[in-house]
Amino acid sequence: MMTAESREATGLSPQAAQEKDGIVIVKVEEEDEEDHMWGQDASLQETPPPDPEVFRQRFRRFCYQNTFGPREALNRLKELCHQWLRPEVNTKEQILELLVLEQFLSILPKELQVWLQEYRPDSGEEAVTLLEDLELDLSGQQVPGQVHGPEMLARGVVPLDPVQESSSFDHHEAAQSHFKHSSRKPRLLSPRALPATHVPAPQHEGNPRDQAMASALLTADSQAMVKIEDMAVSLILEEWGCQNLARRNLNRDSRQMNLGTVFSQGSENRNGSESTSKAEVKGDSTSHGEIAGRFQKEFGEKREQQGRVIERQQKNPEEKTGKEKKAPGPPTAKEKKPTTGERGPREKGKGLGRSFSLSANFNNTPEEIPSGAKTHRCDECGKCFTRSSSLIRHKIIHTGEKPYECNECGKAFSLNSNLVLHQRIHTGEKPHECNECGKAFSHSSNLILHQRIHSGEKPYECNECGKAFSQSSDLTKHQRIHTGEKPYECSECGKAFNRNSYLILHRRIHTREKPYKCTKCGKAFTRSSTLTLHHRIHARERASEYSPASLDTFGAFLKSCV
């Protein structure tokens, strides 16, 4: 009943309710713009692979009960693992990186896992970089008596006063959901906190959202507490969740001030109210309203002090860095709202950042950006992506940039993984060996295709005629026979072909290129098949050199040897 009431009070959407129950919905994004496999036909790029996160979850959540036997279960697991790790595309190092990244994310605290899911790091190094930046942001605002970094989030409990309730932060719905549905239970009564039973219900009439927020924060349990940890983590998710990697460095200073203000106020309020909380427990006659009044007074003084510092910083921006390093008090924030209803600079416009109001009223929250929204748009073709890294990779298609160059032959590539695969041509490295015949390959994808010769596996079947193929590219080419599609058109004469290889051969008619040369007579040809036919002419000429008389003499010689 408490869950239903909490959802009703805060207007929690069904999607947020699913996130509360641990159900993670991952959208399949078509963001890989270039095929990682070396030597595949260009037609394979027409169907980019889905998000690996979908296949990873399928692999991890696979149950034995869904199969008819152990062999089928094992084969299904192999198939799911292959779809997730993609050994035909990824190298050994990349597969190892995926496994280490998954384990690394699993050992992180729940809040950091949720935070990192917004960025979907591709490697462990990228995840560590994000966490180190977060730790630097927090450690830069060190508070006496507390620790640095994420450990700062796990200290202390703050009391919930009526004044605090009426002057609560301007949380959006995602932050409300995090407060109510946190997987960890609130701590029990301590000398640093007041029980929920000591907090009277608000009597004032105001915005219905005010009352909904207040009722959501109060629980029936007399020992329930609102922890500074949940508040801090919500602020981190709010500040960081809607910003991409490119914007993070630009907003670091303002975030440090914003987060530092919250932590500093939480520490000072906790220390200031510690003695009064102990007095409540021991039966002191001090009323809860007096404590709330003192807290409100101290809180108002801090806000006035922050407003004066902001004005000085706006007049003298050069003094900002020095003041942040020297001032022992709570840091200031440009985006903090000094007065009721006034919005910070980042709230004007696109809604990519968030500022929090410390006023007595709840202000309207700017429009939220969904977590799966494709906010990064290509100016050339208009295609959108969820991550800036995917947009950068996509732009290589338009710019033709190939920053990775081979030191041996000078050939350039747009992706580093393709360069690694190419360099094996020069080194002769063939790390992938067949267990059946011992044949080795430089690419894992070639080994997988080779193993189908031994197994006779043809997993790709045509829906029209039922013909099966061992490679998906062969099926794609075959299906064009039924559809009549000819996507490859010659720019010279306009003739179209259903295969890229046919177009390459056709272009040699216009360029007069003849790369296949006979070693006997020096004659050149445009196709290798034509050169093979030409070799038969020389073979017949050699056979005609042996006359019947010479053959009889050679036969007599063999008989004499016997």
From Swiss-Prot:
<dbReference type="InterPro" id="IPR036051">
    <property type="entry name" value="KRAB_dom_sf"/>
</dbReference>
<feature type="cross-link" description="Glycyl lysine isopeptide (Lys-Gly) (interchain with G-Cter in SUMO2)">
    <location>
        <position position="477"/>
    </location>
</feature>
<feature type="cross-link" description="Glycyl lysine isopeptide (Lys-Gly) (interchain with G-Cter in SUMO2)">
    <location>
        <position position="27"/>
    </location>
</feature>
<dbReference type="GO" id="GO:0008270">
    <property type="term" value="F:zinc ion binding"/>
</dbReference>
<feature type="region of interest" description="Disordered">
    <location>
        <begin position="261"/>
        <end position="372"/>
    </location>
</feature>
<keyword id="KW-0863">Zinc-finger</keyword>
<dbReference type="GO" id="GO:0000978">
    <property type="term" value="F:RNA polymerase II cis-regulatory region sequence-specific DNA binding"/>
</dbReference>
<feature type="cross-link" description="Glycyl lysine isopeptide (Lys-Gly) (interchain with G-Cter in SUMO2)">
    <location>
        <position position="337"/>
    </location>
</feature>
<feature type="modified residue" description="Phosphoserine">
    <location>
        <position position="13"/>
    </location>
</feature>
<feature type="cross-link" description="Glycyl lysine isopeptide (Lys-Gly) (interchain with G-Cter in SUMO2)">
    <location>
        <position position="374"/>
    </location>
</feature>
<feature type="cross-link" description="Glycyl lysine isopeptide (Lys-Gly) (interchain with G-Cter in SUMO2)">
    <location>
        <position position="411"/>
    </location>
</feature>
<feature type="region of interest" description="Disordered">
    <location>
        <begin position="164"/>
        <end position="187"/>
    </location>
</feature>
<keyword id="KW-0832">Ubl conjugation</keyword>
<feature type="cross-link" description="Glycyl lysine isopeptide (Lys-Gly) (interchain with G-Cter in SUMO2)">
    <location>
        <position position="297"/>
    </location>
</feature>
<feature type="cross-link" description="Glycyl lysine isopeptide (Lys-Gly) (interchain with G-Cter in SUMO2)">
    <location>
        <position position="278"/>
    </location>
</feature>
<comment type="similarity">
    <text>Belongs to the krueppel C2H2-type zinc-finger protein family.</text>
</comment>
<feature type="zinc finger region" description="C2H2-type 4">
    <location>
        <begin position="460"/>
        <end position="482"/>
    </location>
</feature>
<feature type="compositionally biased region" description="Polar residues">
    <location>
        <begin position="356"/>
        <end position="366"/>
    </location>
</feature>
<feature type="cross-link" description="Glycyl lysine isopeptide (Lys-Gly) (interchain with G-Cter in SUMO2)">
    <location>
        <position position="302"/>
    </location>
</feature>
<dbReference type="GO" id="GO:0006357">
    <property type="term" value="P:regulation of transcription by RNA polymerase II"/>
</dbReference>
<keyword id="KW-0479">Metal-binding</keyword>
<feature type="domain" description="SCAN box">
    <location>
        <begin position="56"/>
        <end position="138"/>
    </location>
</feature>
<feature type="cross-link" description="Glycyl lysine isopeptide (Lys-Gly) (interchain with G-Cter in SUMO2)">
    <location>
        <position position="227"/>
    </location>
</feature>
<keyword id="KW-0597">Phosphoprotein</keyword>
<keyword id="KW-0862">Zinc</keyword>
<feature type="compositionally biased region" description="Basic residues">
    <location>
        <begin position="178"/>
        <end position="187"/>
    </location>
</feature>
<feature type="region of interest" description="Disordered">
    <location>
        <begin position="1"/>
        <end position="23"/>
    </location>
</feature>
<feature type="compositionally biased region" description="Polar residues">
    <location>
        <begin position="261"/>
        <end position="276"/>
    </location>
</feature>
<dbReference type="GO" id="GO:0000981">
    <property type="term" value="F:DNA-binding transcription factor activity, RNA polymerase II-specific"/>
</dbReference>
<keyword id="KW-1017">Isopeptide bond</keyword>
<keyword id="KW-0238">DNA-binding</keyword>
<comment type="function">
    <text>May be involved in transcriptional regulation.</text>
</comment>
<dbReference type="Pfam" id="PF01352">
    <property type="entry name" value="KRAB"/>
</dbReference>
<dbReference type="Pfam" id="PF00096">
    <property type="entry name" value="zf-C2H2"/>
</dbReference>
<feature type="domain" description="KRAB">
    <location>
        <begin position="226"/>
        <end position="305"/>
    </location>
</feature>
<dbReference type="InterPro" id="IPR036236">
    <property type="entry name" value="Znf_C2H2_sf"/>
</dbReference>
<dbReference type="InterPro" id="IPR003309">
    <property type="entry name" value="SCAN_dom"/>
</dbReference>
<feature type="compositionally biased region" description="Basic and acidic residues">
    <location>
        <begin position="277"/>
        <end position="287"/>
    </location>
</feature>
<dbReference type="Pfam" id="PF02023">
    <property type="entry name" value="SCAN"/>
</dbReference>
<dbReference type="InterPro" id="IPR038269">
    <property type="entry name" value="SCAN_sf"/>
</dbReference>
<feature type="zinc finger region" description="C2H2-type 1">
    <location>
        <begin position="376"/>
        <end position="398"/>
    </location>
</feature>
<keyword id="KW-0539">Nucleus</keyword>
